[in-house]
Curated annotation (Swiss-Prot):
One of its GO terms (biological process) is translation. Belongs to the bacterial ribosomal protein bS18 family. Binds as a heterodimer with protein bS6 to the central domain of the 16S rRNA, where it helps stabilize the platform of the 30S subunit. This is Small ribosomal subunit protein bS18. Keywords: Ribonucleoprotein, Ribosomal protein, RNA-binding, rRNA-binding. One of its GO terms (cellular component) is cytosolic small ribosomal subunit. The gene is rpsR.
Length: 75
């Protein structure tokens, strides 16, 4: 009896679509979801964010850190 190979569903970018949230450096609640508990930016292969939106997200997180809206490192 041959088993079917495990089919992993392709994740969809959370920032694409009609009612998708806009990436904004002032929206710290949204940005916090894409930062690890150590304060690092989570890679797109884990969050399923597209490459273009991952660059926007990284820039927004870095801008928020510079303006002291987000911490650089978490204790």
């Amino acid at each position: 009896m041959a088993n079917k190979p495990f089919f992993r569903r392709r994740k969809v970018c959370p920032f694409s679509g009609d009612n998708a949230p806009v990436i904004d450096y002032k929206d710290t609640r949204l940005l916090q979801r894409y930062i690890s508990e150590r304060g690092k930016i989570v890679p797109s292969r884990i969050t399923a964010v597209s490459a273009k939106k991952q660059r926007e997200l990284a820039a927004a997180i870095k801008r928020a850190r510079f303006l002291a809206l987000l911490p650089y490192a978490v204790k």
